[in-house]
Amino acid sequence: MLDSIIKILFGSKHERDIKAMLPILHKINEKEAWALSLSEEEFKAKTDEFRERYQKGESLDSFIPEAFALAREAARRILGERPYDVQILGSLVLHSGKIVEMKTGEGKTLMSVAAAYLNSLTGKGVHIVTVNDYLAERDADWMRPVYSYLGVSVGVILSNMENDARRIEYNCDITYGTNNEFGFDYLRDNMQMRLKDKTQREFSFAIVDEIDSILIDEARTPLIISGAAEDDTQRFFEVDRLIGQLKEVEKNPETGEYPNELEGEEVIGDYTIDEKSKRVSFTDSGMLHIQDILQRQGLIKSGNLFDEENFEYIHYFTQSVRAHVLFHIDVDYVIQDGQVQIVDEFTGRVLEGRRYSDGLHQAIEAKEHIKIAQRNRTLATITFQNFFRMYDKLSGMTGTADTEAVEFTKIYNLDVVVIPTNLPVARKDEHDVIYLNENDKFEALCTEISEAYKRGQPVLVGTVSIEKSELISKLLTKRGVRHEVLNAKNHEREALIIAEAGAKGSVTIATNMAGRGTDIKLGGSPEMRAKKRTGTNPNPDYYEKVLAEEYAKWQSDYNEVKELGGLYVIGTERHESRRIDNQLRGRSGRQGDPGRSKFFLSLDDDLMRLFGGENLKNVMSKIGMRAGEPIEHPWINKSIEKAQTKVENRNFDIRKHLLEYDDVLNEQRSFIYEQRNAILEDENLIERIYATLEEFISEKFDEYSSSSKAEKEERARLIKDIFREKFSYTLTEEDFANIDKKNHEEEINEFVEHFTKELKEKEALAGKENLNMFIRYQYLQAIDKKWLDHLENLESLREAVYLRSYGQKNPLTEYKLEGFDIFYSMLDDIRIEIASRLVRVQISTEEEAHASRQMRSIQGNAQHNSMGSFSGSGHGMGPTALSARSRPENAQVVRTVPKVGRNDPCPCGSGKKYKYCCGKNG
């Protein structure tokens, strides 16, 4: 293998990448005999030595030859598998922070061991990211003995774990988990009220398995933690029963295009749809029709559709039309246990726990006449794009990445390196065959499957939806072809079905579920057959005996299937992405095995219909092609690839555009989370309050003093209101006269002194630690509340700026400018809110509290709080409440009562400030 790699001369970028790593590979191979001579104790001792050297300043790169040799030898001793040179090269690529493209069956899981081991030596933790819990747990269990032999701990994060268990797993040297769990834990950590409740460490190094699936396919789907919002479920039912009265705009029969309403062309219908982007737009007449429908139904009591109280009906109608016209059962979603479950278009799997946002999920539930779940409010959100960009070093592996190399470079600054296979690929990829219509296509491919079935060649049929997989199943049943169906409805049998997909005579119809994380062996799986015979928890000796028998039988089956040509992969439709097609092809021809692949297409397929089918249809008409006749030519393949490239470029632009918007939110989120963490760690929050309050007041006074004469009166009123309502502090005309002269340092100092004195009094009664706990809770509560409101404001802004493009304005620029304006406004609100809460909280003596309790009892107040707590403006103490044990003697916190501020007019009626009158000696 090494000799064949050395022969690579100047060639493609990938060949040059490989050539540059060969000297390091030589050094690793030279250390193999040294590693072979070490005992298990010496392996662990070497790991400790590496850690110590790293802490003293040596780089990880200086350990590569020895560390990789140790990892390779540990795998050989524990698993009986010695990583090939190509796997070592792949691990070098991972360590360098790049993406490895390695074909299916070449051992990506084993390839990651050396890179993960080397980077675990930093003590900062390594995250290995998989697409589901099953793979995370399987890979962790499989590789844990290897890492343990090296003296490295391994953890795994699963969806059903509690916080304490997660923290333990994250503190391991290497942690396996899914992209969802890592992302959600980040969001949950930044919602915690106590530092000790956080689970994750810093984001140092991540290896992402199936990285193209996570960073490309799921890039447009943000992670969202949500809570209950207002209940508007009845509106979805109301609108759903009315939606049948609306009609799609009639298209021009010659061009297949909608008439242009802006150019005065006649429009017949209420709405237009864009299947590519799944958008719905109402015409002017459609809007009036909706208004008329709502008025006749009595749903609009007064005014018109565009009045503020009625305008949201447009949103309900939009989502309802989308649900009926653009989202289809057994294609986009399935119904299981009375719930709408989303089907991943790329994997064919049910996305458990995921819901369409913005009311679309509720609209689909109304369409399907099942119980509508209440809409949720976003509490925290992040995209995978911005989550994974937080890692100091990011790498990944997949069987298909090269087609998206440009996007990986531009968005993530990740290079893609293609690693050659250990053995040459022997699969034969045939030209596509294309038919005029779908019926002809299905008839032809069922004939092809039947012929392969008769000769015993295993067949894997790839479909794009559950609906199509079930249709082909019915057609094959009529022909007497025994087969298995694998889709989101029967995913629990996935392991068993895939294990036998390479057996002689097997026919497997699968959605894209069969495209990832699976390894189809020719002749079937002897391990699965042995487990089936021995049952669960068999006697080890008996299991080994049965396994040996199955292996002997499998060897004969394997040779027979090889003679038949290996696994025959048949695609029933081209996907929008070439990667998905390549994944399907990659099920066949693993590790030098023979194989065959072929796609059967028609002009009715979505890709052909939406992206370039008209050109092909015209060509086929000119050459006199008839129904039932196929066409097979390299030109067809090029034309289809061109259509796919067009879609890929379009989808890349969409993802890039979404990221540009999300970067605005990401910058703001990072700032808020940094502030939150600082507050969790700060043991002297009073000083932070003083500083932020002084800064805020100074800004407000500066705004007043620098404003024009016409603006001054309004600004003075606003500042007075803030000080009176939030701080119980009155600013006089004399104060504003000084501020106007830009001589407001005295006023600032006076206010801060007043505020400081009040807090010192409260600190003396409550105790510094308890007051700090209270301030922390109130601070975090204020941040969280304002941040949630801000997320909603940004979402509304994003929808609003979209329309400004019609006014020749750049929506993104508008979003950035206004987004940061409302962000800074939110920061002001937080500063005011926390200071206001501290001003209003009251602390009284035990005697006063006792008298107050007696008075409440006399008045018949049934509410009783057995735990003394801070309270102010209705804000409870929450988890940091002062208990009787922690409270200083004779001190108790009770509910807020009206009080006179030192700068308020004295209640005696003298006209003087309270501090200069009756409060002089207070």
From Swiss-Prot:
InterPro entries: Helicase_ATP-bd, Helicase_C-like, P-loop_NTPase, SEC_C_motif, SecA, SecA_CS, SecA_DEAD, SecA_motor_DEAD. Residues 854-865 have a biased composition (Polar residues). One of its GO terms (cellular component) is cell envelope Sec protein transport complex. Pfam families: P-loop_SecA, SEC-C, SecA_DEAD, SecA_PP_bind, SecA_SW. Its main location: membrane. PANTHER family: CHLOROPLAST PROTEIN-TRANSPORTING ATPASE, SECA INNER MEMBRANE COMPONENT OF SEC PROTEIN SECRETION SYSTEM. This is Protein translocase subunit SecA. It comes from Treponema denticola (strain ATCC 35405 / DSM 14222 / CIP 103919 / JCM 8153 / KCTC 15104).
